[in-house]
Structures are given as structure tokens and as C-alpha cells.
């Protein structure tokens, strides 16, 4: 594939937002910060993925059906929500990542306004002990090959786009879409 063809695919990027993501004013602000078009569709797992127009004119995903993405971003608004997922919603959360792994998906998990320092200092509103919280993060990183990222909520939209763009660029350069 030529550099021109690679750029043609990458410039067609559209972020797909799972229909379960609420369209709050803050969410709309995040979507607008992608810097590329976005649309809502049903994702089998994850909150965000990206669609691209391939060289033959087809789209990577048919959004009229449930999408099983190659790369996803799961977003948590803070450590409280992440702690909830590891405790009260653990089975549902685990099933989602099992579905992703069954489709060989690459998984990014963004936790806004969190940090390992905040976890270790128990600076979140949950009785979930810091040691157990850290153990869950490290175990799930290994078990589901999840890449955890902590960031400011102001960075989230840009990071979602960047993670998905770079994943596709690596796939193209690795020959995944060569005819």
C-alpha cells in the first residue's frame, strides 16, 4: 500500500460511539473534541471505536449491524465509576471484556481524573480497598490485555481519537488491509 493510499484511509476516520453512551452536554463536548466526524451505533463491547473507508470503497464496519470492533476505548468518568465496575458490576464488566477478547480486540480503558496515586491514597468514594483496586487493575491488564490510561476529562476526546487512529495506522502498516 502506498503512503497516499494509507493517508486516504486514515483521513476517512469516523468515531463510532456506542448507543449506550448518554448524550450529556459534557459528552457532546467530548465528541466535538474528536476533530473528526462521529456517529452513534451499537457496539458489542466498548464505548468507542473507529470506522474507516477502505481502498475498495467499503467501510471497515457495517453500522447497520452490531459492531465487533478490532480496537475499543472503554471510558470511565472517574475512579468511583471504575471501582463500581470492579465491585458491584464486576460480572457485567468482565463479560464485556470476554466478548472483546473473543474477537481479538485491542482494549484501551481511560479513567478520567484518576491516577495510581489517588488509588493508593484512597482518594475516591468507595469502600473498595486500594490494595484490592490495584490488584484488579493489574490482574485485568494481564487477563484481558487492557491498556489503562488516566487523564484529565479535557484530554479524553483527543486521546480516544489518537488511540483509534494509531491502532488503524499500525494495522495498515502491518499489512492487515493489503489486497
Predicted regions and their residues:
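Conserved catalytic cores of phosphodiester-cleaving nucleases, focusing on short active-site segments
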Residues: 71-77
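Non-catalytic C-terminal interaction segments of nucleic acid-processing enzymes
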Residues: 1-68, 80-179
Amino acid at each position: 500500500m502506498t503512503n497516499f493510499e494509507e493517508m486516504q484511509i486514515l483521513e476517512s476516520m469516523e468515531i463510532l460511539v456506542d448507543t449506550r453512551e448518554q448524550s450529556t452536554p459534557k459528552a457532546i463536548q467530548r465528541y466535538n473534541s474528536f476533530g473528526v466526524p462521529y456517529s452513534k451505533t451499537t457496539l458489542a463491547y466498548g464505548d468507542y471505536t473507529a470506522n474507516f473507508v477502505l481502498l475498495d470503497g467499503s467501510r471497515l464496519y457495517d453500522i447497520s449491524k452490531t459492531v465487533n470492533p478490532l480496537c475499543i476505548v472503554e471510558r470511565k468518568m472517574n475512579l468511583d465509576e471504575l471501582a463500581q465496575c470492579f465491585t458491584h458490576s464486576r460480572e457485567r464488566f468482565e463479560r464485556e471484556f470476554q466478548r472483546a477478547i473473543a474477537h481479538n480486540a485491542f482494549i484501551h480503558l481511560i479513567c478520567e481524573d484518576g491516577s495510581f496515586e489517588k488509588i493508593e491514597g484512597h482518594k475516591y468514594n468507595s469502600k473498595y480497598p486500594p490494595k484490592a483496586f490495584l490488584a484488579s487493575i493489574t490482574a485485568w491488564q494481564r487477563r484481558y490485555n487492557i491498556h489503562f490510561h488516566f487523564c484529565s476529562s479535557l484530554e479524553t476526546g483527543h486521546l480516544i481519537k489518537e488511540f483509534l487512529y494509531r491502532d488503524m495506522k499500525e494495522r495498515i502498516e502491518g499489512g492487515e488491509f493489503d489486497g
